[in-house]
């Protein structure tokens, strides 16, 4: 069960730090785990639009919040902005559909993952990431079964990933203390 949280944290950190500007950069064996909405976001992005994403990602520290980042995106490309808003609304609707305990848990994960984002020019601190994942796992394990089931039902692709044996092996080795 705790692997679900590892994945959510890792996906958040990865998305916050390295936008895979092309679906072709993702190994085939992992593409099946990517939600259709994310695939649709990246579908048919031109080199120019990918460059815009890279540029804005490199300036992440200058944005006070998501709305500021979206506004900067809108100033660069209305098409890319529309795609980003659509994806954001999809994720937000899923989170908003959760009952209070599950929603609070997801909001806490998002806040923790965002706090891990390195300052400009700095590298991601892997030990902090591992500790954050351990903390999230502990909080997840403390949730009641109803909340855990709601999270699984709301985020089925996450469940699909965490039940994958290969992913479990990778996650377990990642969290080993050095």
Curated annotation (Swiss-Prot):
Q: Which domain of life is it from?
A: Eukaryota
Q: Is Manganese set as a keyword in this record?
A: no
Name the GO cellular-component terms: extracellular region
Residues annotated as coiled-coil are 67-89, 122-154
Name the UniProt key words of this record, in alphabetical order: Coiled coil, Lipid-binding, Retinol-binding, Secreted, Signal, Vitamin A
Q: Does the keyword Coiled coil apply?
A: yes
Name of a matching Pfam family: Gp-FAR-1
One Gene Ontology MF term: retinol binding
Q: How is it modified after translation?
A: Not glycosylated.
Span of the secretion signal?
Answer: 1-16
Question: Which InterPro entries does the entry mention?
Answer: Gp-FAR-1
* Localisation: Secreted
Q: Which PANTHER family match?
A: FATTY-ACID AND RETINOL-BINDING PROTEIN 1
Function noted in UniProt: Binds retinol and different fatty acids.
As for family, the record states: Belongs to the fatty-acid and retinol-binding protein (FARBP) family.
Q: What is this protein called?
A: Fatty-acid and retinol-binding protein 1
What species is this protein from? Litomosoides sigmodontis (Filarial nematode worm)
